[in-house]
């Protein structure tokens, strides 16, 4: 009797054939880069995010650079992406990562969720994609 591939095997096979692997935030993955992409992608199409992400990373290549930037500069760079609360929360969260965690993103979902604008799915992405850990991503 032939056994059918499991759901996870079929899903991974589908990803190998059709999954996106060349997006800017998929290169040189760090917790910071994963976090920025996850926040930008909330309620925003990938094609819209790509140029914003590229510009944002060129101006703020590290969480420290973002934390030290004036909020007005961050909001100006965000112009056109919408949902400005995301940028405000990112700026405040960056300041907290620098001041409370020595510039290193926590590797715990529970701790990440204490930062402004980071919910369960974003925290899971940071842990899994940025730190190489295991956490659910919705």
What are these regions (language model features)?
Residues 3-138:
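Catalytic cores of DNA base-excision repair glycosylases
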